[in-house]
């Protein structure tokens, strides 16, 4: 069987109104991922329908966004010669950060859209910094609205230089910077004849050359549980996405924090594994699976539990333990002080955590300490903090298992901060 094309999850980031949605719309439109019947309608209108058609697509996308849902996920897959690409979310959506951290869709790469008319804006910086914090290692830049400056090379170069500085400071290397006009369709899918001075790839060509994300098969097995079903004739079937490691039929797995909470090992042998209703012998990172474990009942485990091998079980942080984390405060109405107890979201879990200590405030750009033991931290600050969970939960240091070490902090219906676990302090 021929090797299937790799799947890549892309997230679009950038300042509000710089053209993220238009760029997505143009990609889908020019790769013919807009429903056939709609295209037909406009073709019947002849010339008049042409410019109209793209505007209509954009309106549809906008309408869906205003109803509080991002672009209908069914339409956000498209294919390039060497990749299947899924657009997993477009920011501006209030749960964007939470979705990126807890979603089954960790982004492999980001497209940073910057309008040539504005250059780097506050949100451009914030999104780029966030992409770094969330572990997105590949980024490409689309300098949009080139039609508004008559496709001027000088203006492009000036903005490209700003973006380059920002991204290099954050530790990004080797990122293409592409001049585009999403509205006119220049250099998104079709090569532009209006910028003869540019000889690099179009946006879709650059996406097609994205490095394939490595599968972390060498890391310990971790499967955060999304749901637990009881299936007649089979038994209890936990469902989740393999984040790291490999699960094989016959393996013995243990569930945490269930085992810690019940004071007995909730574990058993894996009798069967299924993906998309097909039985399989082994599951790899990225696979969304259901699996049946001998001797584990429906009431033993729930969403937020994590399965791992018994010889390398998931790490549990209990209320008597703490963990040290680096966070970036995205949105807090006043200030965060010791004692603040919001809800932490990571993989499939949600647990209230208490801020025990504010160790240091960092310069978000360099990571250097600017203040030790600050009294408070506020929106825009990056900090090292000590957190204590109010009940047992599974989380791992980002250096050991990055896929299990990132989290969002939420309160009052919004994402207050994003962060990553530096180390875990167990109380003996």
From Swiss-Prot:
PROSITE patterns found in the cross-reference section: G_TR_1 (PS00301), G_TR_2 (PS51722)
Segments forming domain tr-type G: 5-215
Gene Ontology molecular function: any one: GTPase activity
Cell compartments where the protein resides: Cytoplasm
Chain positions covered by the region annotation G1: 14-21
Stretches the record annotates as G3: 89-92
Location (main, coarse): cytoplasm
Pfam families assigned to the protein according to its UniProt record, in alphabetical order: GTP-eEF1A_C, GTP_EFTU, GTP_EFTU_D2
Function text: GTP hydrolase that promotes the GTP-dependent binding of aminoacyl-tRNA to the A-site of ribosomes during protein biosynthesis.
Protein name: Elongation factor 1-alpha
Species assigned in the record: Thermococcus celer
The gene coding this protein: tuf
